[in-house]
């Protein structure tokens, strides 16, 4: 999703200039020109469809995990599988192990075939941009950082002129490359603020599913309720892109990258606060109050607390808006700030932040049970709000730097 550009005074001419999205980060642009979206190429839609298929597979596998981690109280299937007729448990286990290894072998061979085809396809498609090999850029980047560390953590110490003057040494990089590393490090610092954001975002695929299981679902599987998150992302995305951002630009409101991410953090805090409120309502409602599905009135886990599951809807709406403001902007920010040959590396660090967020989620697992869930959501809401404040204080200066760069 393309982020809104800085608002500027309208051009005296009425001509509309379309900016190619692939050139925005590398070509000097007249700030008085209006900013409009370029047409998305068909190849991009193909890649988007493939990515959607991958996400379908990912969530199709991971979402049921929560149900296995916390099976219904009355479920016998979650505990054992009875053999049919005279089959023995040993036979079923042997077949199961064979199926596992056979499936893994099929996956390996299918993946190997797909890789071979993906190497051949670009040779016959003129739409692929083929770049000449430039070698591994990581050793050069490591050398720049090493020089900066020896120079008291100042990147200026890695400049060719500094190395030549102080060490009579010629280096293999230029000032442009050092400045690219400087911008890439800015993106890496911003990623640190997203660790707790990813912890909160992961609640949609675990604890919020369990929360739905404690409510009246009217026959809808509780793991299906979490589908409201991607639904609202799809709905709110165009609303924000086509409605909010142009409106802010029209009124000369500078809603830049750092501002959008900080706003998304506050929205994420609000979604966790609302989830805490929903959990409080569940605990205040019978038949089991703060012990859902476990009291005698639940009839062995069959009767949840009498709260409508669609009370969760605002949680997913706010969470979707937070995801659009913060996560989408992070992807854009890391891509535009990263050095030309290190974009994939810097964006991969975003996934490292997600891994750290998951580690925090594991650490707070002792709170993820009744009747402590309300305090877990409240703690996440407060912590996320504090992160938003600190994030804004530390990184708001980069808004001004971005305006100067543009």
Swiss-Prot record:
Residues 1-25 are annotated as: Disordered. Peptide transporter; part of the gene cluster that mediates the biosynthesis of imizoquins A to D, tripeptide-derived alkaloids that serve a protective role against oxidative stress that are essential for normal germination. Belongs to the major facilitator superfamily. Proton-dependent oligopeptide transporter (POT/PTR) (TC 2.A.17) family. The chain crosses the membrane at residues 184-204, 220-240, 262-282, 309-329, 344-364, 373-393. Pfam families: PTR2. Induction: Expression is down-regulated by ralstonins, lipopeptides produced by the plant pathogenic bacteria Ralstonia solanacearum. Expression is positively regulated by the imizoquins cluster-specific transcription regulator imqK. One of its GO terms (cellular component) is membrane. Residues 14-25 have a biased composition (Low complexity). One of its GO terms (molecular function) is transmembrane transporter activity. InterPro entries: MFS_trans_sf, POT_fam. It is a multi-pass membrane protein. The lineage of its organism: Eukaryota, Fungi, Dikarya, Ascomycota, Pezizomycotina. It is found in: Membrane. This is Peptide transporter imqD. Keywords: Membrane, Transmembrane, Transmembrane helix.
